[in-house]
C-alpha cells in the first residue's frame, strides 16, 4: 500500500468546496492512480476521522498560452470526502 501522504496531495479551497463544508464534505487533489478505498484509508489515517463516502472525478487541464507558444496545465484527480456526523478536519476550520 502507498503512503497516505502520497495519496492526498493538497486540499482544494474554492468557493464551491467551501460551501460543501456545511454538508461535512471536504475536497482534496489526490494521486490520479489512487482508488476510492485508498483515499478513504488515507483520510482516516492522517486526520483520525471516519469517512462515510468518497466521490472522485478526473479534471482535464486547461489550454494556456504564453505569447504564441501553446501549452496545457496538467490533468488531475479530485476527491470529495464526506465524513461521519460530528467529525471535522481542523485543517479546514476558519474558512
UniProtKB/Swiss-Prot annotation:
GO biological process: translation
Keyword Manganese (UniProt): no
GO CC annotation: ribonucleoprotein complex; ribosome
GO MF annotation, one: rRNA binding
Family annotation (Pfam families): Ribosomal_L23
Keywords recorded for this protein, A-Z: Ribonucleoprotein, Ribosomal protein, RNA-binding, rRNA-binding
Keyword set includes rRNA processing: no
Function as written in the Swiss-Prot or TrEMBL entry: One of the early assembly proteins it binds 23S rRNA. One of the proteins that surrounds the polypeptide exit tunnel on the outside of the ribosome. Forms the main docking site for trigger factor binding to the ribosome.
NCBIfam families: PRK05738.1-3, PRK05738.2-4, PRK05738.2-5, PRK05738.3-2
Subunit structure: Part of the 50S ribosomal subunit. Contacts protein L29, and trigger factor when it is bound to the ribosome.
Family indicated by similarity: Belongs to the universal ribosomal protein uL23 family.
Record-given protein name: Large ribosomal subunit protein uL23
Species of provenance: Pelotomaculum thermopropionicum (strain DSM 13744 / JCM 10971 / SI)
